[in-house]
UniProtKB/Swiss-Prot annotation:
Originating species: Aspergillus oryzae (strain ATCC 42149 / RIB 40) (Yellow koji mold)
Protein name per Swiss-Prot or TrEMBL: Leucine aminopeptidase 2
NCBIfam families recorded: leuko_A4_hydro
Cofactor: Zn(2+)
A GO BP entry: peptide catabolic process
Length: 615
């Protein structure tokens, strides 16, 4: 029987993963803080998926130094092909001959990272919370693993991984710590840390961090890891909810598969809210708000343990299968009740509307299924796959009724466990699952799948339960009536409101066609104590209200906040709004802090402030 070679369905990789699939990776690295480099080697076990028809292995790389390459222990001829931006330079490894279908070859590559590595951020002691030691962490999503080591940098390929990491400081990785071995002391007061990831994962979930890290329990199968000076407050913030979150999602899908669920609270320059690295979620310190109001980030990253990490989008064009499902599961965590789920969805709708407004209503990146051929997936990053994806699943749930949709959820996550899929397989699976239920089958056949997948702009807005926002809407309408009404703001206006309700209030005020006056903006901050809030979700929105109002008393605090946090959710809108009222301050603030930001964040802000400029 002839071997069928399928064309790869991921346009953002240069690898020939349609000929070879990496099944296991052994990554051995020495962390060199002084040189800001990882040095070591990576071994790929690759399975042939043709019958001796491929005599070359092509891997993704981007700005890595390659030493030698061995195939099955023998030195091999290799070359770096000309760079194809933004994807890097493909590494072509020649084989003497092809190998049979399903036979294995072992490729060992010695490698060093360079200063152009986009996956690693190196922090000076001054950039950490206790200012004592340097720190390093990785962020490989979407296509940055290739800047650490040559790999098939696509979510359509999954490998088990062994990590052997030597560092002078504690290490965490996206594998289970190999316990029962004594961490081995190395020359120069370094220690070897070993981790094993027994479940196959895509390259974007390869993760490392090293620094002054301590751990404390937050549940029977969970620890929080962070800087020692922040450990107790992080433990308090997370210990009340983490195990409850795990139980809640297990009831909806099936038991947690990864053994431990741990959370690493990173230094403040981490660019995302969280990154769902298996075993160790990497999370921003902005969730530590001292009121347990922002732990939904943990619910979201935990939900990725099923959607994304076990069942994965086959390419970044179908990113909603990761993020839409995860947002859906996060909101199904019923610790707060159904009204809160709708409340969270209303906040999400506002975020979706903002993203559509930012790109433009007919922009291709506002589609659920995007075309990323020749594009950098980071450029398409926004709330759209999260919130448009959530709203599609929420629409299907309401269409079918929750009890029927709930029967589909574990079926879907079982069928694709350990696999990657695209939107068309999702659709086919749903239609097939309900084919013997005439009512459900007819309802699904009448869904305008093409409009959901390919229409740009906002989807149809669902009927949300507005009970938790009605009180906020009422208060925002009073603010809207100023200065023409007799409304006098008082502290009692917000008594009993959660921080997330304050977020909605501020978002409503940002929607006013006529911004607040500078004087009213100051009253808002003073009477409701918003300017001093330790909850960045609140303070960043208050600053945006002030910037829109032209209230110059928030300009300096905005610039100060931009020097303390690197989460793009806050950084990008604050820069966009600051530059509208004081562009010199925005540019000065960016130039002062650009080395503090993660390379991904820095590149995005540069585009926001300057358009595409050369390095």
């Amino acid at each position: 029987m002839a071997t069928v070679i399928h064309s790869p369905r991921d346009p953002n990789t240069l690898s020939n993963y349609n000929n070879w699939v990496s099944t296991h990776i052994t990554a051995t690295f020495d962390i060199l803080f002084e040189q800001k480099k990882l040095v070591g080697n990576v071994v790929h076990k690759l399975k042939s998926i043709t019958d001796a028809r491929s005599t070359e292995i092509i891997l993704d790389t981007n700005h890595v130094d390659i030493g030698d390459v061995k195939v099955d222990g023998q030195a091999s001829h290799w070359e770096l092909l000309p760079p194809l931006e933004p994807y890097g330079a493909a590494l072509k490894i020649n084989l003497d001959q092809g190998v049979g279908l399903n036979e294995m070859v072992e490729v060992e590559i010695s490698v060093k990272t360079t200063e152009k590595c986009t996956a690693l951020q190196w922090l000076t002691p001054a950039q950490t919370s206790n200012r004592k030691h340097p720190y390093m962490f990785s962020q490989c999503q979407a296509i940055h693993a290739r800047s650490i080591f040559p790999c098939q940098d696509t979510p359509d390929v999954k490998s088990t991984i062994d990590f052997n990491i030597t560092s002078p400081l504690p290490v965490v990785a996206s594998g289970l710590p190999v316990r029962g071995i004594i961490e081995k002391a190395q020359p120069g007061s370094k220690t070897l840390y070993q981790f094993h990831q027994k479940l196959p994962i895509p390259s974007y979930l390869f993760a490392l961090a090293s620094g002054d890290i301590s751990e404390a329990a937050i549940g029977p199968r969970s620890v929080v890891a962070t800087s020692p000076d922040k450990l107790s407050e992080c433990q308090w913030e997370l210990k009340a909810d983490t195990e409850n979150f795990i139980h809640a999602i297990e009831k909806i899908v099936y038991p947690y598969a990864w053994g431990e669920y741990n959370v690493l609270i990173l230094p403040p320059s981490f660019p995302y809210g969280g990154m769902e690295n298996p075993i160790f979620t990497f999370a921003t310190p902005s969730i530590i708000s001292k009121d347990r109001e922002n732990v939904d980030v943990i619910a979201h990253e935990l939900a990725h343990s099923w959607s994304g990490n076990l069942v994965t989008n086959a390419s970044w064009e179908h990113f909603w299968l990761n993020e839409g499902w995860t947002t859906y599961l996060e909101r199904r965590v019923s610790l707060h009740g159904e009204a809160y789920r709708h409340f969270s969805a209303i906040i999400g709708w506002k975020s979706l509307a903002d993203s559509v407004e930012h790109f433009g209503h007919d922009h291709p990146f506002t589609k659920l299924v995007t075309d990323l051929k020749g594009k950098d997936p980071d450029d398409a990053f926004s709330s759209i796959p999260y919130e448009k994806g959530f709203n599609f699943l929420f629409h299907l749930e309401n269409l079918l009724a929750k009890d029927k949709f709930d029967r589909f959820i574990p079926h879907y996550f079982t069928k694709f466990k350990g696999k990657s899929l695209d939107s068309y397989e999702f659709k086919a699976t749903m239609l097939e699952f309900f084919q013997h239920d005439l009512e459900a089958s007819n309802l699904l056949k009448n869904v305008d799948w093409d409009a959901w997948f390919y229409a740009p702009g906002l989807p149809p807005k669902p009927q949300f339960d507005t009970s938790l926002v009605d009180v906020v809407y009422e208060l925002s309408s009073k603010w809207k009536s100023l200065p023409d009404s007799s409304f006098q703001p008082r502290t009692s206006d917000i008594e009993g409101l959660t921080a997330n309700q304050i977020v909605v209030l501020l978002e409503q005020i940002l929607l006013f066609e006529r911004p607040l006056t500078p004087e009213l903006s100051r009253v808002l901050g003073e009477v409701y104590s918003l300017a001093k809030s330790e909850n960045i979700e609140v303070s960043n929105l208050y600053f945006q209200v002030g910037l829109r109002a032209g209230d110059d008393t928030v300009y300096k605090p905005t610039a100060e906040l931009l020097g303390k946090i690197g989460r793009m959710k806050f950084v990008r809108p604050l820069y966009r709004n600051l530059q509208k009222v004081n562009r010199p301050l925005a540019i000065e603030t960016f130039e002062k802090n650009k080395d503090f930001y993660h390379p991904i964040c820095r590149a995005m802000v540069e585009k926001d402030l300057f358009g595409k400029r050369e390095e």
